[in-house]
């Protein structure tokens, strides 16, 4: 065969039997019913249906997901939750509207601000000093912002966060609906939660969930749900703007099979995973429910040096999802066996874990000088951080922690933000620069 560098690299790594504590949720184990993908890789034909026209077997499969999540409608996404967030904000807002945005939102939400020319009012989260992460969104803070900015049309938040922090979605929905607004939830990391209990996801008007992150489904497979005013036709129209006109049939079939698999035995496996994570949280320094409401399966280890802890795990062929200066984030799923957890526990005994460093709370956001749209589409250049003072950021400067942009697109880089970034060690990384106009 001709030279195949990517395929060779992937197969060589897989052959090393890495313990995959990262997404995708299938962990490299066979996906149910998908032994011969080529046999079901079709295009839009009368027997196979059309994702963006609705109906048929695709529509039936989507309706079963909607029923499972207790939502009115569901649309399969083959462009990941990024496609879903863009589509959801397209439905929730008209160009030029004002949106209340969780400042810790995924970059797809920031791109939606620019593409739709939305005006952001940023919503801060409380800083949990001992845990070294941001906490849940406060309904009281949302109420304050809606009173101060009655022009807000929608609230877009992330729940759960990368660190597994959950917000009170029923309370947030009540506040938004009382003010006539729309609740958009980026639940990319929470597709598994309905199999573990009621976490309020169905209170959202628009909900995005990444099956590939925490369920046995292939990369990029995700789901967009709606309630109330947003019909299935609305979902199809908005998602088709950002998705391929040739969506993958094997990927859509995998979503169908994933749901059936979870109902047949995956739920029991996920409950076992939650029990294993609870046990590890007791034995090793980690975020717990004493810090904040958490996804019961997200394992966030605490360490004096998160990057060193990550390297120590990787040296034992255990591969985390990510690390920051004080944490290592692991994503156990229903695909992880008891022997996988035993292997993880043995590896953790060789890692220096302990309280995370005392990171300061994020600074007050800088002045907004341009809209996100103006910032994204303007010419740009790169400057070292210390030379960027007074310039306008064209992209996020978002170190972990805190996991939220210290400087958002369109904001002016100021002394206070530079000092904070240096304080948390952002400038110690190689070749750090900020894009400016």
Q: What are the language-model segments listed below?
A:
Residues 428-437:
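Charge-dense polyanion-binding interfaces
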Residues 2, 6-11, 32-33, 53, ...:
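Conserved PLP-enzyme active-site core in the AAT-like
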Residues 1-56, 181:
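N-terminal "arm"/small-domain region of PLP-dependent enzymes with the aminotransferase-like
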Residues 73-75, 209, 317-321:
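A short linear hydrophobic-aromatic micro-motif
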Residues 38-80, 104:
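Conserved N-terminal alpha-helix of the aminotransferase class I/II PLP-enzyme fold
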Residues 285-409, 420-426:
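Conserved C-terminal alpha-helix-loop-beta "cap" of PLP-dependent enzymes
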């Amino acid at each position: 065969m001709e030279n195949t560098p990517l395929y060779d690299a992937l197969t060589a790594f897989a052959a090393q039997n890495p313990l995959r504590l990262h997404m995708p949720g299938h962990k490299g184990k066979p996906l149910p019913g998908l032994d011969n993908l080529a046999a079901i890789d079709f295009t839009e034909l009368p027997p196979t249906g059309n994702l963006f026209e609705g109906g048929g077997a695709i529509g039936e499969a989507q309706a079963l997901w909607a029923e499972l999540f207790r939502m009115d409608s569901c649309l399969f996404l083959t462009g990941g939750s990024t496609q879903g967030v863009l589509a959801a904000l397209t439905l929730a807002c008209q160009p030029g509207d004002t949106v209340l945005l969780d400042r810790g939102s995924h970059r797809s939400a920031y791109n939606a601000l620019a593409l739709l020319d939305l005006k952001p009012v940023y919503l801060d989260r409380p800083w949990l000093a001992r845990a070294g992460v941001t906490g849940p969104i406060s309904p009281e803070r949302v109420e304050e912002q809606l009173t101060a900015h009655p022009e807000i049309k929608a609230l877009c938040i992330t729940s759960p966060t990368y660190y597994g922090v959950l917000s009170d979605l029923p309370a947030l929905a009540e506040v938004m609906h009382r003010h006539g607004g729309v609740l958009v939830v980026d639940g990319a990391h929470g597709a598994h939660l309905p199999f573990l209990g009621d976490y309020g996801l169905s209170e959202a008007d628009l909900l995005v969930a990444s099956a590939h992150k925490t369920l046995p489904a292939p990369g990029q497979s995700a789901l967009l749900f709606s309630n109330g005013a947003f019909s299935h036709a609305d979902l199809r129209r908005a998602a088709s703007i950002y998705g391929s006109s040739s969506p993958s049939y094997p990927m859509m079939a995998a979503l169908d099979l994933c749901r059936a698999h979870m109902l047949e035995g995956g739920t029991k496996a996920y409950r076992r995973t939650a029990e294993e994570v609870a046990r590890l949280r007791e034995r090793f320094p980690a975020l717990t429910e004493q810090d904040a409401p958490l996804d019961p399966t997200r394992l966030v280890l605490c360490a004096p040096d998160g990057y060193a802890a990550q390297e120590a795990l990787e040296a034992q062929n255990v591969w985390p999802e990510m690390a920051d200066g004080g944490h290592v984030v692991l994503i156990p799923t229903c695909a992880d066996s008891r022997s996988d957890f035993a292997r993880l526990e043995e590896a953790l005994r060789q890692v220096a874990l302990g309280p995370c460093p005392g990171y300061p709370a994020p600074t007050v956001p800088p002045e907004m000088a341009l809209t996100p749209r103006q910032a994204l589409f303007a010419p740009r250049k790169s400057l070292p951080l210390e030379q960027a003072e007074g310039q306008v950021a064209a992209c996020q400067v978002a170190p972990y922690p805190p996991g939220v942009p210290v400087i958002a697109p369109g904001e002016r880089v100021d002394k206070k933000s530079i000092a904070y970034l240096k304080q948390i060690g952002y400038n110690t990384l190689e070749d750090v620069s900020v894009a400016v106009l």
